[in-house]
């Protein structure tokens, strides 16, 4: 009985780790020549693929703060329209590889991390980006302002679809 239980636990942990993938999805190439210090600060969510953890949320924004240990404190905040209350989630992000490649892993609970990959970025002013999660079902368009020029938004949506 103990060997069956051990096998079950091993399978459970293997599946859990696979579900918490931090590598970029196939075909996704994170931005290189990335400057974390320029990326820090507040970003507003312009568009997203909807998921249960953000469903019904409006005015979503994220703030990234550099910590003394080199990690990044992530503060996600949004207005829950059903409950008519603000919700906040605090997490921690770490670079997966070198700090010049915009590929990080983020955790909002315990040892479980998911990928955060900047795949397009306004390299000149860091005003907008396109972010992929652990797979192509998780995509966001954050920007420094609450609105993006229509042509920029359309370009990012087109890139996200390709």
Protein language model regions, located:
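Bacterial N-terminal signal peptides that target proteins for export
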Residues: 1-9
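Bacterial N-terminal signal peptides
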Residues: 9-18
